[in-house]
Amino acid sequence: MALSFHKRVLSAERYESAGIFDVNGDGIPDIVSGNYWYQGPDFKKQHKIGGVTAHDEYYDDFSTIAMDINGDGRLDYITGGWWGQTLRWRENTGDYTKDWPEHIIAQTGSIESTRAWEVDGDGEMEFVPNTPGAPLVVYKLIRDAQGKGTGKFATHKLKLSGRENKDQGHGLGFGDLTGNGRGDFILRDGWLEAPADPYNGTWIWHPDFDLGRAPSVPILVVDLNGDGKNELILGEGHAYGLSWWDYRIDAAGKRTWTRHEIDPLSSQYHDLQWVDIDGDGKNELITGKRFRAHPQGDGGDKDPYGWYVFKWTGESFAKHVIDFGPLGTGKGVGIHFAVADLDGDGRLDVVAPGKDGLAVYFNQGNA
C-alpha cells in the first residue's frame, strides 16, 4: 500500500474537533470545526457558527456529531467538553448570518469526548459521553410518530452489577464481546456485558483487564483475525502506546486477555477510526497524535508527530506514515477527526483538527 494524499491547510485555529456534513442542504459536504464551518466543495468560504468558549489553550468542544435533532430537515450537531460539563447540541437554523443557538441536553460532568453508537437495536444512534469522573449514561433522541427528532432527549443511566455506576474513567468503547449481537461497553479496567433490555436490564461487570491510565475514545471493537470474535484496538491518550488486545476463554468460561503492540514509540493516540481508506474492501486503522493533549506532562508530548494508516497484515499491523515532523510540518488529528469522501471521487478523505490547526487531506489513491 502506497497511499498518496494532497494536504491543504484550512485554518490555524486550534479547535480539536471536526465533522463533515451538508450544512446548507445543497448536497455538497461541508466541514464544521469549532466556531466555523467551511463551505464545500472548495472549503474556501468560512462561515461563523460562534459560541464556542476558550479555556486556556483549549476550546470546550470535543465532538462534532451530525444529526437532525429537531426534525426541521437541517443537520445540527452534538458536542460537549471538559469545562462546561454539559452535553449540548448546536442548532442549524438555516440563517448563516447569525450564531447557531446552543441547547443543553444534560449536566454530565466533564466530558473527554462523545461518541454515537447504536445501543438499543432500533437502528438509530444514541449519544454516549466519556465522563471520567461521572456515571455511564446513554442519551437517546426522542422522535415523533414520523421518526423526526423533537429536540428532546431521554436520559438512561445504566444499571450495573459488580461495580457502582459513578466513575467511568478515561476511555470508552462499544461493541459485541460475547457474540450475542448486543453491544457491550468497554471501560479502562473492564467491560460491561449488555442485557437484552439495555435501559431497564442490568449490565454485568467483567474486570478482565487494565487498559492503562487513559485509553483512547473510542476503544475500537473489531474482528481483526477473522476468528468470529471481536478484539480491542486502543491508543494511550496521554502516554506512549498503541495496541490491540485479544482473548481466550478457558473451560470454566474465564477470559484471559493478551496485549499486542502496534506502535509503542508514539504517544497521545486519543482518537481512532476503523475505515477502508485504500479502497481494497478491508478496513484500516487511522489515527495520530493529539497535539498538546495536555499542555505538559504527557509522555512524548514534545516529540515530532503526525498521523498514520495502520494496515492489518493478518497477524500484525504495518505502519504507513501520511504526515510527520515537528510543529509546522507534521500534523495531528485532535480529539475528534473526520473521514468522508469530500470531492466525490469515491475515496475517503481526512479532516484533521487540533491545536496545530485544521487541515484537509485529499486521498489521491495508491501511488
Task: Indicate where each model-derived feature is located.
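Beta-propeller-forming repeat regions
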Residues: 1-367
